[in-house]
Design a protein with these regions (language model features):
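Helix-adjacent hinge/juxtasegments
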Residues: 50-89
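Conserved beta-strand elements of the Class I
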Residues: 37, 92-94, 111
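Glycine-rich, aromatic-bearing surface loops/beta-hairpins
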Residues: 108-151
Length: 151
């Protein structure tokens, strides 16, 4: 059952800004020993995120698995999946897809990353309304300053 959905609103519309923010959010959750699924909009986006998770930080990398290429490994804590379909169970779902994922209710926490792209904002508002109508607790966060200046 979903306990909370956090909407992170980014100021720009560059794909790399959303992806970098998703990586940083994933790293933070990973360091707290959480299981994370990053749901991308496409297989191509998942492959780009796959590369970025290895290189986005000079200090570290995030071990992960592309679940669309093979069944989930039980020891893996970070999964990348492309919509559609139900990604593996996890503590946190980072949603970069344009729609609610299948079986979204099984994730205790969901992070929706919304940028300034007009269509993504519109779809994000639709998801916000859906969650709200289903009485899921929601929080909205403005992008942190370092995303605003380095995005």
């Amino acid at each position: 059952m979903t306990e909370r959905v956090d909407f992170y609103v980014l100021p720009g519309a560059a794909p790399n800004q959303r992806w970098n923010f998703a990586c940083r959010l994933t790293e933070k959750a990973y360091l707290k020993d959480l299981r994370i699924v990053i749901l991308s909009a496409s297989a191509a986006e998942a492959r780009s995120l796959d590369d970025l998770l290895w290189s986005f930080s000079d200090r570290s990398f995030i071990p992960h698995q592309l679940v669309d290429e093979r069944p989930p490994d039980a020891d893996t804590r970070v999964y990348l999946a492309a919509a559609p379909g139900a990604p593996p169970a996890a503590d946190l779902l980072v949603n970069l897809a344009a729609r609610l994922p299948d079986q979204w209710q099984r994730y205790p926490r969901i992070a929706e990353i919304i940028d300034a792209d007009e269509e993504r904002r519109r779809l994000g508002r639709e998801r916000f309304k859906t969650y709200r109508d289903l009485k899921v607790p929601l929080e909205t966060h403005a992008a942190p300053d370092d995303v605003r200046h380095h995005g």
